[in-house]
């Protein structure tokens, strides 16, 4: 009748790969048999000296129960307690205080920023792509990449671009696909963006928002840096991974 387990919390919103946590998350959120869910965003508060990206949680499932879960979120001396429907969203929003704000945002029914955001490896160049050179040659295009842990740019033959060729001639706001771990607060949530003029491409170290004009790119960059934008992202980004899905609301 009862199941009690302690597990990493990254199932709530994140996890590498689509299939790794998606099925488990859907089952956990859709099954109303969870009586108690206790979440520790900072795993070291449960296991001192141990780092678990996204935190630790434990839950009590009751096969005879069908109702709301009593959710406790514990971070240091602060504790939030609420009775909640776990399936209110497609991911579990850990901070109860954020739910009211999120409802107001969703009520606007505005178009998601993901409509101008690419997926990973937008030009099919992997993060370790090497077929580039430091000086411009005929039919080259600038390529933005990370080499030896540093952001830099080089040149690559336009003919090597096999994917999203229509996006070469767009202004881009490049954003890293991983940043931080999300355990301690306050923190930036997202890495620093780069504006890449048209024409340009990038390796798989980046995704990008694509627009037509420089001023639009500057507007996206400015919005990306706001606390409001990062707050919304933080509701889905609970590990270091910053995949396209974390920008979805």
Q: Model-derived features: where do they sit?
A:
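Conserved Class I SAM-dependent methyltransferase catalytic core
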Residues: 1-45, 58, 220
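C-terminal substrate-recognition regions of SAM-dependent nucleic acid methyltransferases
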Residues: 44-203, 209-249
């Amino acid at each position: 009748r009862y199941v009690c387990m302690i597990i990493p919390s990254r199932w709530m919103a994140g996890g590498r790969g689509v299939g790794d946590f998606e099925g488990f998350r859907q089952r956990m959120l859709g099954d109303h048999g969870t009586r108690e869910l206790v979440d520790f965003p900072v795993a070291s508060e449960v296991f001192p000296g141990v780092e678990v990206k996204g935190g630790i949680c434990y839950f009590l499932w009751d096969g005879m129960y069908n109702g709301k879960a009593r959710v406790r979120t514990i971070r240091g001396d602060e504790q939030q307690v609420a009775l909640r429907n776990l399936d209110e969203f497609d991911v579990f929003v850990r901070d109860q205080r954020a739910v009211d704000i999120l409802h107001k945002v969703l009520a606007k029914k505005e178009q998601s920023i993901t409509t101008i955001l690419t997926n990973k490896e937008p030009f099919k160049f992997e993060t370790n792509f090497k077929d580039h050179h430091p000086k411009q040659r005929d039919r080259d295009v600038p390529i933005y990449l990370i080499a030896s842990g540093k952001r830099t740019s080089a040149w690559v033959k336009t003919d090597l671009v096999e994917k999203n060729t229509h996006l070469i001639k767009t202004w881009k706001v490049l954003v890293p696909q991983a940043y931080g771990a999300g355990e301690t607060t306050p923190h930036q949530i997202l890495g620093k963006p780069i504006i890449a003029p048209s024409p340009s491409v990038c390796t798989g170290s980046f995704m990008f928002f694509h627009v037509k004009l420089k001023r639009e790119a500057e507007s996206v960059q400015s919005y990306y840096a706001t606390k409001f934008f990062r707050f919304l992202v933080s509701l889905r980004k609970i590990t270091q991974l910053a995949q396209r899905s974390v920008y979805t609301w």
